[in-house]
């Protein structure tokens, strides 16, 4: 295969950066899995096209934010399947991150949106819209009271969204091949390095 990319990275001012890229990947020998006989096979060629944009702004010496979007398109291999590997790769992904960084304390809030991922064309009508596009939020906090010590707290999936990153059946939780991500959870601890 071969990947080509063209892009722009620029500093708009002392506190703002912007980037934009277009990419294309051409694969000659894509490997796929046949569910009927449980064997891998050569599925032929595939072309992936996409683009991304990202804007980062520092509001002061401690607080910054980044907004980004990535768009991906993979043509359907036949009339019986959806684009983007039969709808399992999202057409769009949004990322919005807020960061605070001080000498002893830092934290970040990340909001991620996965949009237009309907799953297989054969089962798409049975997929709830809430599974085709999902939004999640995660929070991470770190405090360094002394050199070598880090006290941390992470709150993942703040809004307790039911979703999956990996599935062979988007219809509902508990369906064939549904691998859900953890619900709201937190991790807290202390690290010490020397």
PLM feature segments, named:
Residues 65, 113-121, 142-194:
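C-terminal beta-signal and adjacent terminal beta-strands/loops
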Residues 1-19, 24-28, 32-58, 86-92, ...:
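Outer-membrane beta-barrel signature, preferentially recognizing the C-terminal barrel domain
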Residues 14-16, 61-63, 92-94, 103-109, ...:
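Outer-envelope beta-barrel architecture signal
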Residues 130-135, 142:
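Short amphipathic alpha-helix initiation/capping segments at coil-to-helix junctions
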Residues 1, 33-39, 77-81, 121-127, ...:
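Extracytoplasmic loops and strand-loop junctions of Gram-negative outer membrane beta-barrel proteins
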Residues 6-10, 53-57, 67, 96-100, ...:
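Residues on the lipid-exposed face of transmembrane beta-strands in outer-membrane beta-barrel proteins
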């Amino acid at each position: 295969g071969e990947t080509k990319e063209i892009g722009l990275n620029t500093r708009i001012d002392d506190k703002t950066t912007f980037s934009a890229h277009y990419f294309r990947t051409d694969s000659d020998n894509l490997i796929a899995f046949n569910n009927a006989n449980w064997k891998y096979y050569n599925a032929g060629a595939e072309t992936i096209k996409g683009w991304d944009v990202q804007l980062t702004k520092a509001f002061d010496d401690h607080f910054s934010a980044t907004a980004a979007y990535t768009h991906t398109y993979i043509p359907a291999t036949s009339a019986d399947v959806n684009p983007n590997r039969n709808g399992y790769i999202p057409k769009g992904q949004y990322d919005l991150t807020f960061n605070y960084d001080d000498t002893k304390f830092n934290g970040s809030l990340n909001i991620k949106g996965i949009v237009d991922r309907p799953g297989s064309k054969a089962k798409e009508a049975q997929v709830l819209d809430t599974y085709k596009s999902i939004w999640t939020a995660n929070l991470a906090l770190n405090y360094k009271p002394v050199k070598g010590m880090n006290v941390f707290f992470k709150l993942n999936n703040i809004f307790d969204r039911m979703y999956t990153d990996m599935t062979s059946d988007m219809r509902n939780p508990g369906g064939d091949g549904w691998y859900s991500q953890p619900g709201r959870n937190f991790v807290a601890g202390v690290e010490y390095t020397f």
